[in-house]
A protein has these predicted regions:
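N-terminal targeting and processing segments of secreted/endomembrane and organelle-targeted proteins
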Residues: 120, 488-489
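A short glycine-threonine-serine/GTX helix/turn-capping micro-motif
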Residues: 269-276
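Intrinsically disordered, low-complexity Ser/Thr/Pro/Gly-rich interaction regions
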Residues: 278-439, 455-475, 481-483
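N-terminal core-entry segment
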Residues: 1-268, 311-313, 446, 450-471, ...
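Short, contiguous strand/loop micro-motifs
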Residues: 157, 175, 275, 424-425
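Composition-driven detection of intrinsically disordered, low-complexity segments
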Residues: 239, 484-485
Length: 489
């Protein structure tokens, strides 16, 4: 049996009763987190533009666009919700099983799969248990493919959330549609030819578009396959197939016979983001916040801040002096400066107005990111970070964190996840809605229908924001705005 066939065989045969209770528990947390960051992201300019695009296209089959009163055909709802889920770079990240993997992180696994499952799940009127099963299956396929693909894929410039995310999404949708094994094979073949997404677009609106297109591609490919559309039946392993063309190969031992054995959510796990910024900044972000609070530090006390990491981190956190909030998400100097000045690093901190503040710009100039030889030698399975703060009085304060809160080694509690959800959801829906969503996800497996959840994820609060006049204004603003991207140093 070839690999493509093996993936399709797993998806077609796995049932809800096969899923370990611990995986169900973990999945509920990832889903709650994914819905929260998507609600927050639904208010972002990039989401407003996509929402306007979806509204203009129209269509008869209606599925909810989160945080709004807008509905759309399933592929376009998946697009809009996928963009929203990644708009703030606040969605979860997949760990690697190898110390040699780039960054030790691979994809943002939840957003493409969740956006696709939510849209098609509403369309097909599935139960909460069916929702959970499809999500878990999609994430498992996505994570195993991402873990096995040659690291050259990401190193050469592909964004794996965009490319691999679609393959997870299409299998999740295929599970909802109850596609047979031979149809799932074709669905993979179709979706693999749709895969794209380039890292040069990091720091722009196109990065979240990658996640949205992955979700949309998954829905479209599954529906086409269901209708009889043909594709290669060995698309993953073929010489001119996905792994070889996109990466020059893959490690078969990391995927063959590994689907659900154990589930990737269990080992090595998925990390939930404590901050709305690039994952590689999070151990340092955690550390600087703890040091600042423990020593009651203020900007006026600090002569310099030195941040040491492995050599891969500067290749992703590429903005030494960001000009926009999008760029600030990939900037160690901003992450350090805002933590010192505000002792927080939440949604309210990653906004354009903060990035441009004189006091922030001044403090960013005192931050240096360097490659630490000791941390480099330890490998890339964790984003180990060391901080050295030199004070004007001659004192030096140092610390090191290997992982941040939300990592499987430092997991967030349900209460912490609920608090993050409320922070995110508060941008888009009333507090009562947020509370209902938390309750519904906690008992998701018992839901006979998704209707109560869908209703709670949209609101009258968003209606005013989603008016055609305001969306048109957002579109016009974007046409006039020039993205002044800083190049790699």
């Amino acid at each position: 049996m070839g690999l493509t066939q093996e993936v399709a065989n797993y998806v077609s045969k796995v049932s809800y009763k096969d899923i370990p209770s611990e995986v169900i528990r973990l999945a509920r947390g990832f889903i709650l987190d994914g819905l929260g960051v998507a609600l927050a992201g639904s208010t972002d300019d990039c989401s407003r533009i996509v929402q306007a695009h979806v509204r203009q296209i129209g269509g008869k089959q209606k599925c909810a666009v989160l945080g709004t009163t807008l509905s759309a055909p399933a592929p376009k709802a998946a697009l809009a919700n996928g963009v929203a889920g990644h708009a703030m770079d606040y969605d979860d990240t997949q760990l690697s099983t190898s110390k040699k993997a780039v960054y030790g992180l691979l994809t943002h696994p939840t957003t493409p799969v969740l956006a696709a499952v939510l849209a098609v799940g509403e369309r097909q009127k599935i139960t909460g248990a069916e929702f959970l099963l499809a999500y878990i299956v999609g994430v498992e396929v996505e994570c195993r493919i991402a873990d096995s693909i040659n690291p050259r894929h990401y190193q050469s410039g592909f964004h794996s959330t965009a490319t691999v995310g679609g393959l997870g999404a299409v299998m999740a949708v295929g599970k909802i549609l109850r596609l047979k094994e031979n149809v799932l094979v074709r669905a993979l073949g179709i979706c693999a030819s749709m895969a794209s997404g380039l890292r040069e677009n990091f720091g722009t609106m196109t990065k979240p578009l990658h996640a949205g297109r992955a979700a949309e591609n998954g829905v479209t490919a599954a529906l086409l396959a269901q209708s009889g559309f043909t594709a290669a039946t060995n698309i993953l392993e073929a010489q001119r197939g996905f792994f070889q063309v996109m990466a020059g190969g893959y490690d078969e031992s990391k995927i063959a016979g590994r689907l659900g054995r154990p589930y990737f959510m269990q080992e090595p796990g998925i990390s939930i983001k404590p901050y709305p910024s690039g994952s590689l900044s999070h151990p340092a972000q955690d550390l600087i916040l703890d040091l600042v609070k423990a020593h009651d530090l203020h900007a006026s006390d600090i002569e310099s801040i030195e941040v040491g990491t492995n050599s891969n981190v500067p290749n992703a956190l590429i903005y030494p002096m960001p000009k926009t909030a999008l760029e600030a998400k990939f900037s160690i100097p901003f992450c350090m400066a805002i933590a010192v000045l505000e002792r927080k690093a939440g949604i309210a901190q990653f906004v354009d107005s903060k990035v441009r503040q004189k006091r922030v710009v001044e403090l960013m100039k005192r931050v240096t990111l360097y490659v630490d030889d000791e941390l480099e030698a330890l490998g890339f399975d964790q984003v180990r970070s060391r901080i050295r703060i030199k004070l004007h009085n001659g004192r030096t304060i140092e610390g090191r964190y290997d992982v941040a809160r939300g990592h499987p080694e430092r997991p967030m509690s349900w209460t912490e996840l609920a608090d993050k959800f409320k922070e995110c959801a508060g941008l888009a829906v009333p507090a009562d809605n947020a509370g209902r969503v938390i309750d519904l996800i906690a008992r998701l497996a018992q839901l006979k229908t998704l209707n109560p959840l869908i209703r709670a994820l949209g609101s009258s609060k968003a209606r005013k924001k989603s008016s055609p006049r305001l969306i048109h204004a957002s579109l016009q603003h974007t046409k006039e705005h020039k993205w002044n991207r800083t190049r790699k140093p």
